[in-house]
Amino acid sequence: VKKSSTELVITLEEPLPPSVKAGDAVENADFYPSVVFRNNIVRNNRARGSLFTTPEKVLVEGNLFDHSSGAAILLAGDAQGWYESGACHEVVIRRNTFINNLTSRYQFTNAIISIYPEVKQLNKQKDYYHRNVLIENNVFKTFDVPLLFAISTDNLKFVNNKIIYNNDFRGWGQKPFQFRRCANILIKNNKVQPPRTWSIEDCKLENTPADQVRIEN
């Protein structure tokens, strides 16, 4: 029963299991959207470029992300502040162009593509928050900032992308890939200018075993 724009009363047919306690979050799964975000120009945003968070399919294709202040793309999720929608289960980010994102460090500015669910106790997680994220055939024209940051993500692929570095802004001097409690990561067939090859030394790993990251140049 809807009592107001911010309050619902839910009547259950059976008692809740003992594991459900006060403070747990509930979502209406009937209203999860799928998303196709295609052929748009996202330019000069003061925060992140675009934020996507839904368990349904997400396709981000053929867009220009130009000089966003923070991350160009943010996959979020939490039940403690913003109450962004639940975990992403299938995300494809392909054939986009990213130009000099992360020109400031205001908020959620860990990388050009930032997968940032807000999880208080990662070590106590029984499963990963996000999963099945494919980043392919994109062009990054960027100064020296991290390309990809992820927390609690399983099956993450960064493949067949082109990265062209410039000196338009002062570099951060950080590793291009940063993973915090992630698994099944593939970094493959990416082209970098000026030429370089990536190794596990280009990854900052927290609570992520090195054998969960496969790099093929």
Set out the residue ranges of the language-model regions.
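Extracellular parallel beta-helix/beta-solenoid repeat domains
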Residues: 1-217
